[in-house]
Curated annotation (Swiss-Prot):
Gene this chain is encoded by: secY
The organism of origin for this protein: Methanothermobacter thermautotrophicus (strain ATCC 29096 / DSM 1053 / JCM 10044 / NBRC 100330 / Delta H)
Keyword NADP: no
NCBIfam families, sorted: 3a0501s007 (TIGR00967), PRK08568.1-5 (NF006341)
Protein name as catalogued: Protein translocase subunit SecY
HAMAP family: SecY
Amino acid sequence: MEQLKEKFEPLFSVLPQVKSPGYRVPFREKLKWTGIILVLYFFLAQIPLYGLSANAVDQFAQFRAVLAGNFGSILTLGIGPIVSASIILQLLVGGKILKLDLSRHEDKAFFQGLQKLLAIVFTFFEALIFVLTGSLAPSAPQFVWVLILQLTIGGILIIFLDEVVSKWGFGSGVGLFIAAGVSQEIIVGAFNPLSAPTQPGVPAGRITGFLYLLFTGQSPDFQYYVLPVLALIAVFLVVVYAESMRVEIPISMGGGKRLSRGAVGKYPLRFIYASNMPVILTSALLLNVQLLANVFQKLGYPILGTVSNGQAVDGLAYLLTAPRSIDALILDPFRVVFYAVVFIGLCVLFAWLWVEISNIGPRHVARQLYQMGMQIPGFRSSRGQFEKILKRYIPTITILGGAFVGLLAFVADLTGSLGGGTGVLLTVGIVYRLYEEIAQEQLMDMHPILRSFLGD
């Protein structure tokens, strides 16, 4: 492991990086940087790819919410390379192939450097695949490398924008870009006043179209106009309720200066313990299956399935394509069941990996609580006792939470939710966590004495 570090660390030193703040970033400054990056993201998403064919079709539209990219712009790749790099490293660390202890500063810094390097490699690799397989067809052969260069630059810009948000803003850039893209898609999908080519004169927005047909005495299609909006509302309510669910472990102060000895409180464990990361990672993994299906078909070996007009029509790639209509339950039940089992299973796997790698597993939480001088009433104060009790709860809620978000995303996709079921699920969770972080930061700015207690 030490030899690997010696080989890679010189590379990390030459990679550009966003400087970490040497002080606690105030609330207003975090808000400023988050706003600036959001404006930059929307601006870059409107810069078109020079040399792209006018007939190019978004073959990965079903993953667009998770990619947080805008097809046809320099941000077409979105956060795909970042998440793909994260998947590879999580599997390597989780499988003990890379023996890193991410609670140690040195190992965590090495992990982050390796992730950035791998994300840049994936940016070029995915740009190459998108262009050479025809997913982003050039208008002329001489524009092939021009397109690859533009996509690579856009992907690298996303990597550094994400780093700015993570260090200077609220939440993470990955979450911010997903929420921004899906929110835009929901607003346009619901209220677009322009008519679609398939229905001249009828507004393309689900709500505007429904009202137009209603007021002109026509009968709106329930499954097309109403069901996606109802599914959107249902997913929103379920996610908000699930985010508020907690398993609370009673704790008390075993001594110390900050609080009086014996003060009793509760340590909350979220039901969705791994947040929405399992869904992001699972969706990104399935996207890579579709990409590889295109590559193998281009090479003349369609081992993952046949791709026609950018869509998998058979094989494993087809089975791992999300069903987007309730009709699929009747027309292709095997595919629906197969996809559901794989999707939910992967969400559980990534939930477990994320908990271990993010240092929120029983061992790390036990050490944190013990170092704060906490104890559980009725038990002796020891790190081992903390870990033993937390092991009763954290693994269980990790598995249940991962399965829950996977099932919810699958069902929401099946109903054709406005903004995409997975996209809505991710956005609601991201915005909810962002709201909590903003509220906490504002509270600490108003009451500085709370900073030490909240661990800042």
